Amino acid sequence: MSAANATGEGQDAIAWNREMLPPGPEQDAVIKGITGEITEKGFVVASLDKLVNWGRTGSLWPMSFGLACCAVEMIHAYMPRYDLDRMGIIPRGSPRQSDVMIVAGTLTNKMAPALRRVYDQMAEPRWVISMGSCANGGGYYHYSYSVVRGCDRIVPVDVYVPGCPPTAEALIYGIFQLQKKIRRTGTILRG
């Protein structure tokens, strides 16, 4: 073991890389350092928060709460062109099996209790993506007496995806933003 490794110098880029590096020589150096650590010691040290958040971001299971035409755009994100399945984002039909709810479409006053009930059935930790202008703030039907002016009045929303209807690319970008948010949060309650 060299003197630099014994004092911990030179390991900052390897051990505490906070941002994802683009492909290139910097990323190659980080990967080489990690694989070298594995071959020397047989293990890699990481914090539990980072490990758990890595698992959560790599296996999001969204449940569609499709209320209107935005739900059709959501289906496009799962088709072969974008294929969210290859990123570990597998759609689920049951709230008990999902950890992300995508609210897409106009939420009416009559449907609001059902949305809250489904949200309450989801296991912790759970996240909500509001997709489209109608789910974000009422959209075209904002002034109607029967429309909730944003699903954030019923459930807490983590990511808003704008558009009428938003494209599949916009939804995928919203999912990536949710993954960033999950990476930033702590998993262990410290008191």
Curated annotation (Swiss-Prot):
Its cofactor is [4Fe-4S] cluster. Keywords: 4Fe-4S, Cell inner membrane, Cell membrane, Iron, Iron-sulfur, Membrane, Metal-binding, NAD, Quinone, Translocase, Transport, Ubiquinone. This is NADH-quinone oxidoreductase subunit B 2. NDH-1 shuttles electrons from NADH, via FMN and iron-sulfur (Fe-S) centers, to quinones in the respiratory chain. Couples the redox reaction to proton translocation (for every two electrons transferred, four hydrogen ions are translocated across the cytoplasmic membrane), and thus conserves the redox energy in a proton gradient. Signal peptide: none annotated. Belongs to the complex I 20 kDa subunit family. It is a peripheral membrane protein. The lineage of its organism: Bacteria, Pseudomonadati, Pseudomonadota, Alphaproteobacteria, Acetobacterales. Its main location: membrane. One of its GO terms (biological process) is electron transport coupled proton transport. GO terms for cellular component: plasma membrane; respiratory chain complex I. It comes from Gluconacetobacter diazotrophicus (strain ATCC 49037 / DSM 5601 / CCUG 37298 / CIP 103539 / LMG 7603 / PAl5). NDH-1 is composed of 14 different subunits. Subunits NuoB, C, D, E, F, and G constitute the peripheral sector of the complex. Pfam families: Oxidored_q6. The gene is nuoB2. It is found in: Cell inner membrane. Binds 1 [4Fe-4S] cluster. It catalyses: a quinone + NADH + 5 H(+)(in) = a quinol + NAD(+) + 4 H(+)(out). Its EC number is 7.1.1.-. [4Fe-4S] cluster binds at residues 69-70, 134, 164. GO terms for molecular function: 4 iron, 4 sulfur cluster binding; iron ion binding; NADH dehydrogenase (ubiquinone) activity; NADH:ubiquinone reductase (non-electrogenic) activity; quinone binding.
